């Protein structure tokens, strides 16, 4: 599997970059900060949605000023092209895709961040931990694979997760503790179950005793109940007799009292009949009096009607005079009314033009004020800064800044070489001090004590020289850093001046444009106002005439409804009323000078006297009717008394015997009450016991249900315990480490056989932190830290590839980020040779560097440089 291409948009320092990888060894070169490592970050982000740098949030990966970043990676695997597209920030994860490219046609395989990551692992067999620990090599970290090799291997193999799994605080132990707690809980439940069963047996015995006691009470109750029913029946019969006895006595007494009262009422019958005959004679005069009263009232109403009509006649005469005067005034105002209507019509026609005239006048006034303000701003605005001169100054300053950056990078590179040389000499000095015997650890030749001391002294002298150079270069770099800081400040200041000048120029040009537009609009409005002024003058003149005529117009409207027809109608009404009044007066002439009201009062007084006698007559009729009724009632009551007396004799009721029966009934009720009370008490106890037994049965059933799982939990606990033991270091972990050790060693030695090295084989010990050993041709076993720099780099690269190949079957590419950091010239040349040799093992190598010497190793060169705040890509050659 190899990387064919990556497209970067708004990612870190890249605006829009398209990088193709066409060579076997692709060298990406550029100054520090040019955006080289950003390409490796983009590859990592494409594969795992994570960059290699420590970005706290995905927004940090987006280029400043942009809202979204997109990275598209093209991979070739087994003859197929896969396109992986990733987006940042997280709100765009749903747009992540992986597609298969066939004949320029894309077929989307998966969509969404999580699904795409799973598909990459499934299709390409890429593991994030393995890649980042082996074939993606960070800056100056080629040999870091030697450090803590067991820990690195465990991390790659996910053994650290196995250790966490079986840890005393891990998930297996946590589950075991939960199961054990459950087993302890079930043991307590078993104890509670036994207690519940004992309680159930005890309560069942109590229930049987209560049932027997209830049976005895039921027998006694049945016997007493029969006695009670007999006495109740007898008591009910006596109660009925008593009730009827009381009713009969009460009725007899009442009937006797009623007869006495009725006889008192009948004694005045003869006197009342004589009084009735006398009243009937007096009442005959009433009808004549009523007839005379009605005639008088009719005459009285007609006189009132005549008086009302005379009032109406008077009102009509007044209205008639008023209307005649108003009609005369209306005729005088008619000409002014017509003139006002005519002017009103003309004003309505001119209204729209007048509104337009006023609107344009207001607009003209507003525009002239605005024009005056803009002309004042133009006269106060001064454009004194030359933008072209500022551009030239900024260009010169940026060139100076780039020169200083290049100078600093060159010094930093030389300083790195010095540090690398110092480190190598210190290691060599340390190795010489550790050597036992007289054999050189590097070449295997004989080494005398004098020769050893001579080498040590030479190394110490060389270290002193290098230390002086180190201090000198640091001072130079600090001096250049100061100059770079000053240049950056000047550039920022000039950039701000340029931005202000551009804004001022834009504002000035905008004001000139506004001035021209306003003048044009003012001219157009003035022309239109001049055209409308003739209508405006006419409108003002007519408005004045309208104002003068309006009072007469409004007065005319008051008389608008006054017509000759209305006057003629009033005259007709006047004649009719005069005729009607004359006819009425002719009919009531006989009553005209009489006091009709007094006459009516006299008649009414006599009628009232007669009505009083009528009322008295009605009262007498009522009394006589009552007397007849009373006479009949006396006869009925006497007959009823005879019947009731006969019934009382037949009833045969004895009050003393009735009281004896009641006492016997009360005694039996008390006995039955005591029995029922005892039964209620026993039934309550019975219900409580039955509920307790039912509850205990359910409780026991629940305990039994829960205890079913006890054996399963014990079995599960034992299995987890065994699993935790098997996951220990001396079992599964040891098996995994030994299996991988064999695969890695075979692959490592197979790869190293293609390099020209002075040892026969290399051994890996994952239990040793420095567990890499090389065997010389003489069979000597040397730790990796005693080997030369070139040999260590060769083994480090081979080990990385071997681990990756063992865990991912196939390794298609190797990425080296700034591999020459801290290397001197000699070790750089060694690295170039090693890279060339590595091509035989891995089909694609990508080298990121600022070191021009590494161009010798590449067959496809990609150069990056920083322009402003953006990285720019340029392909140099493809030899």
Curated annotation (Swiss-Prot):
PROSITE patterns: ZN_HOOK. Zn(2+) binds at residues 440, 443. Its cofactor is Zn(2+). The keyword Acetylation does not apply. One of its GO terms (molecular function) is zinc ion binding. It comes from the Archaea. One of its GO terms (biological process) is double-strand break repair. ATP binds at residues 32-38, 139, 786-791. Pfam families: AAA_23, Rad50_zn_hook. Induction: Part of the nurA-rad50-mre11-herA operon, these genes are cotranscribed. Residues 184-304, 342-436, 502-722 form a coiled coil. InterPro entries: P-loop_NTPase, Rad50/SbcC_AAA, Rad50_ATPase_archaeal, Rad50_ATPase_DNA_repair, Zn_hook_RAD50. SUPFAM superfamilies: P-loop containing nucleoside triphosphate hydrolases, Rad50 coiled-coil Zn hook. Residues 394-492 form the Zinc-hook domain. Part of the Rad50/Mre11 complex, which is involved in the early steps of DNA double-strand break (DSB) repair. The complex may facilitate opening of the processed DNA ends to aid in the recruitment of HerA and NurA. Rad50 controls the balance between DNA end bridging and DNA resection via ATP-dependent structural rearrangements of the Rad50/Mre11 complex. NCBIfam families: Rad50_Sulf. This is DNA double-strand break repair Rad50 ATPase.
């Amino acid at each position: 599997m190899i990387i064919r291409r990556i497209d970067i948009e708004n990612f870190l320092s890249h605006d829009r970059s398209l990088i193709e990888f066409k060579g076997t060894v692709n060298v990406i070169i550029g100054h520090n900060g040019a955006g080289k490592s950003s390409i490796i970050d983009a590859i990592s982000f494409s594969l795992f949605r994570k960059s290699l740098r420590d970005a706290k949030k995905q927004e940090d990966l987006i280029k400043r000023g942009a809202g979204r970043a997109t990275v598209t990676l093209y991979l070739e695997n087994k003859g197929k092209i896969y396109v992986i597209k990733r987006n940042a920030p997280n709100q765009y994860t749903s747009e992540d895709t992986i597609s298969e490219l066939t004949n320029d046609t894309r077929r989307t395989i998966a969509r969404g961040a999580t699904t795409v990551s799973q598909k990459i692992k499934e299709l390409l067999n890429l593991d994030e931990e393995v890649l980042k620990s082996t074939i993606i090599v960070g800056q100056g970290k080629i040999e870091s694979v030697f450090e803590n090799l067991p820990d690195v291997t465990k991390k790659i193999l996910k053994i650290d997760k196995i250790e966490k799994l079986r840890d005393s605080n891990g998930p297996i132990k946590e589950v075991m503790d939960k199961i054990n707690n459950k087993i302890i809980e079930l043991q307590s439940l078993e104890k509670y179950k036994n207690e519940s069963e004992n309680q159930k047996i005890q309560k069942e015995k109590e229930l049987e005793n209560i049932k027997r006691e209830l049976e005895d009470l039921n027998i006694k109750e049945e016997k007493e109940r029969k006695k009670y029913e007999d006495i109740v029946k007898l008591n009910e019969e006596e109660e009925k007799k008593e009730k009827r006895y009381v009713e009969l006595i009460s009725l007899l007494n009442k009937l006797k009292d009623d007869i006495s009262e009725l006889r008192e009422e009948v004694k005045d019958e003869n006197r009342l009949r004589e009084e009735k005959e006398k009243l009937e004679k007096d009442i005959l005069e009433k009808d004549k009096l009523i007839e005379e009263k009605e005639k008088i009232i009719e005459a009285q109403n007609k006189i009132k009607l005549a008086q009302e009509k005379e009032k109406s006649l008077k009102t009509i005469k007044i209205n008639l005079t008023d209307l005649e005067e108003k009609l005369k005034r209306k005729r005088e105002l008619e000409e002014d009314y017509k003139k006002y209507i005519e002017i009103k019509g003309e004003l309505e026609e001119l209204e729209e033009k007048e509104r337009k005239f006023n609107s344009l006048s207001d607009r003209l006034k507003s525009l002239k004020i605005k024009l005056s303000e803009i002309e004042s701003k133009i006269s106060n605005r001064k454009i004194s800064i030359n933008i072209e001169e500022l551009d030239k100054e900024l260009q010169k300053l940026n060139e100076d800044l780039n020169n200083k950056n290049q100078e600093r990078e060159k010094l930093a590179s030389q300083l790195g070489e010095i540090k690398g040389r110092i480190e190598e000499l210190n290691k060599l000095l340390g190795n010489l001090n550790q050597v036992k015997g007289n054999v050189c650890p590097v070449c295997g030749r004989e080494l005398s004590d004098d020769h050893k001391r001579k080498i040590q002294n030479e190394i110490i002298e060389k270290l002193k020289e290098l230390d002086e150079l180190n201090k000198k270069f640091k001072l130079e770099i600090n001096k250049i850093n100061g100059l770079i800081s000053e240049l950056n400040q000047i550039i920022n200041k000039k950039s701000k001046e340029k931005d202000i000048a551009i804004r001022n120029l834009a504002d000035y040009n905008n004001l000139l444009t506004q001035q021209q537009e306003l003048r044009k609009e003012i001219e157009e409005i003035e022309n239109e106002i001049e055209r409308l002024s003739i209508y405006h003058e006419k409108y003002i003149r007519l408005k004045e005439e309208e104002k003068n005529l309006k009072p007469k117009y409004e007065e005319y409207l008051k008389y608008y409804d006054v017509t000759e027809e209305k006057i003629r109608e009033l005259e007709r009404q006047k004649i009719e009323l005069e005729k009607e009044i004359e006819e009425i007066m002719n009919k009531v002439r006989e009553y005209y000078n009489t006091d009709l009201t007094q006459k009516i009062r006299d008649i009414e007084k006599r009628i009232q006297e007669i009505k009083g006698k009528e009322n008295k007559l009605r009262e007498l009729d009522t009394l006589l009717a009552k007397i007849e009724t009373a006479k009949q009632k006396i006869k009925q009551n006497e007959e009823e008394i005879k019947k009731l007396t006969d019934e009382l004799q037949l009833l045969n009721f004895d009050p003393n015997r009735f009281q004896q029966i009641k006492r016997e009934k009360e005694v039996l009720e008390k006995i039955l009450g005591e029995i029922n009370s005892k039964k209620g008490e026993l039934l309550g106890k019975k219900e409580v016991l039955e509920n307790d037994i039912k509850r205990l049965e359910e409780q026991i059933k629940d305990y039994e249900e829960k205890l079913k799982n006890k054996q399963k939990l014990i079995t599960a606990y034992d299995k987890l315990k065994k699993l935790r033991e098997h996951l220990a270091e001396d079992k599964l972990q040891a098996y995994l480490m030994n299996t991988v050790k064999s695969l890695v060693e075979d692959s490592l030695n197979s790869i190293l056989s293609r390099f020209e090295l002075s040892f026969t084989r290399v051994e890996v010990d994952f239990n040793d932190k420095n567990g890499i050993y090389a065997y010389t041709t003489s069979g000597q076993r040397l730790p990796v830290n005693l080997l030369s720099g070139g040999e260590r780099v060769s083994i480090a690269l081979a080990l990385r590839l071997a681990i990756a190949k063992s865990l991912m079957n196939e390794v298609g590419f190797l990425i080296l980020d700034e591999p020459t950091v801290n290397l001197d010239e000699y070790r750089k040349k060694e690295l170039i040779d090693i890279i060339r040799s590595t091509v035989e093992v891995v089909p694609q190598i990508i080298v990121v560097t600022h070191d021009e010497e590494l161009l010798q190793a590449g067959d496809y060169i990609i150069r990056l440089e920083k322009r402003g705040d953006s990285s720019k890509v340029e392909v140099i050659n493809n030899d």
